Every structure is written in C-alpha cells, then in structure tokens.
Amino acid sequence: MLDEEHGGLGLEQPITTLMAIYEVLGQYGAPTYVLYLLTGYNTIVREGTQEQIDACLKYLGTGEQVVNSACTEPGAGSDVSGLVTTYKRENGKIYLNGTKTFITSSKGVKYLIIMCRDADNPDVISEFFVDMSKPGISLSPL
C-alpha cells in the first residue's frame, strides 16, 4: 500500500488492509490487473528510483494497467527456485536473458518487474524494472 507521500493512506498495517481489499475485489469480480497494480506499485515505491516511481505514479487512478511482475517461466512455473532467466552486468549496462510465460494481465503494460538470477552467481536473485518499449523485448500471446 502506498504511503501518504505517494498518494496513499499511510496505513500502519498495509498487509491486513491489502488482504481485505483483495477479498472484496474478488467478490465483485474486479479485473485481475487491479490486484497486480496494488502490489506492483508498492514494490516500485519501496525499491524504485525516483524516475521509476514518477513514471508509474502518473498513471495512478487512471484505471490503466501500467506494471506487472514476471517470475513464471516455462518448465519452472512460479517456483523461483527453478528460475533460469539471468542478468549480466557489462560495460555499465545490465542485460537480461530468458523467457517468461503466463504473465497474467500483462499484455500492453508499460513496465514489467522481471525476476532473474545473476549469471555469474546463480544464488543471487534480483528484480529489474523493465520499460517494455525498449528494443530486444518480444511478446507472444498464448
């Protein structure tokens, strides 16, 4: 849940509140992207750069799906112990290499938070904020 600084309520027990929100949204058949937005925004506000925060929060309240998380992979499902997508740091840049699948409600999102392993140290798992308009990214409907 967002803090007051970013337009939220600044709740003391955001997880309890989030669970209640999910339950009510589910009862009314809310679109799934709403559920992904709630947690995605929280991750971005907590871990993102100011530029990333601003890029996402400008869409807050528009109803547009802006961000989603991608950890599910072919052959591994959502079990992160089976992640094979990797990242490598070279010449001041970070390169991601791998395939994600079944990323629910992600068609048309502007940004994905992609989970992957360090190619040089596979015990390290990180998440990266990826602008989906950048070259080298391809999407395929299932």
Regions found by a protein language model. Give the residues of each.
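Buried hydrophobic positions in well-ordered alpha/beta secondary-structure cores of metabolic enzymes
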Residues: 3, 21, 49, 69, ...
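Short, solvent-exposed loop/turn segments at the edges of secondary structure
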Residues: 38-39, 80-82, 109, 123
